């Protein structure tokens, strides 16, 4: 049983690292106010600079004005132990990570049909400041698309996120 728990925790950390990387646009190991602003705005929110600064302060243990992975991991662990909004315990250790992945998937799946098309992927990448050619977007879809339908479903998305962390 302990071996299963360790594996789940390792998988969860890998999922959290991928979520962290989604925010950490320049890959320097910390989430700045500007990076947080970019992602939050891509989710359709319009926070003030003060609200963004407060979000960072809430988790910035070392007080340096950015969120490092350890601080992000601590935040995710606290969320998981609270069991989310339903008040449940933290026994379902994969639930928080699964919910994070589902939220990330929803960002890409603009029409909420359960599939990410090349056009949806292109739109999100542009809104995040990524400049990709049509060929690069299509290549990303081909690499993730296991069933060959030209789109990425949730299971393919999860697999892609897990592989990109290795």
Swiss-Prot record:
Checking InterPro entries in the record gives: CALM/Myosin/TropC-like, EF-hand-dom_pair, EF_Hand_1_Ca_BS, EF_hand_dom
Q: One cellular component GO annotation, for this chain's record? A: cytoplasm
Report residues binding Ca(2+) 4. 145, 147, 149, 151, 156
Where Ca(2+) 3 is bound, by residue?
A: 109, 111, 113, 120
Residues recorded with modification N6,N6,N6-trimethyllysine: 131
- Record-annotated residues binding Ca(2+) 1? 24, 26, 28, 30, 35
User: In what residue span(s) does the EF-hand domain sit?
Assistant: 11-46, 47-82, 96-131, 132-166
- Pfam families, sorted: EF-hand_7
- Positions binding Ca(2+) 2 in this chain are 60, 62, 64, 66, 71
Q: Which UniProt keywords apply?
A: Calcium, Metal-binding, Methylation, Repeat
Q: Which GO terms describe its molecular function?
A: calcium ion binding; enzyme regulator activity
Q: Which family does it belong to?
A: Belongs to the calmodulin family.
* Function according to Swiss-Prot or TrEMBL: Potential calcium sensor.
Query: What name goes with this protein?
Result: Calmodulin-like protein 5
Q: Which organism is it from?
A: Oryza sativa subsp. japonica
